Amino acid sequence: MKQNLYISYNTQGMVLSSYPFGYDFWRIYNGYTKREAIARYKEELRQKLGVKRLPFSFREVKD
C-alpha cells in the first residue's frame, strides 16, 4: 500500500502528514462543501503567507 504524505501549514509552521489537509482545513471545512472549503483555505493560507498566488496547487490524490 502506497503512503501519501502531504505538506500542511498550521500555527507551528509546515507539517508533513498523511492527511490531505491540516487541522486548519478541517476547522474551516466544517459546514461548507469541499470546494468552498478548499477555496476558503487557499485564500486564508495566501493571506497568512503574504503572497499574491500560492506557489503550489491543491489536488486530491487517489491510491
Region locations from a protein language model:
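Short, flexible N-terminal segments of the mature chain
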Residues: 18-36
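Short intrinsically disordered terminal tails
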Residues: 1-3, 59-63
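Short N-terminal "domain-start" leader segments
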Residues: 1-16
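Short intrinsically disordered, low-complexity segments
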Residues: 15, 22, 41-43
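Intrinsically disordered, low-complexity serine/threonine-rich segments
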Residues: 11, 20-24, 59-61
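A short, charged, amphipathic alpha-helix used as a generic interaction element across diverse proteins
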Residues: 30-53
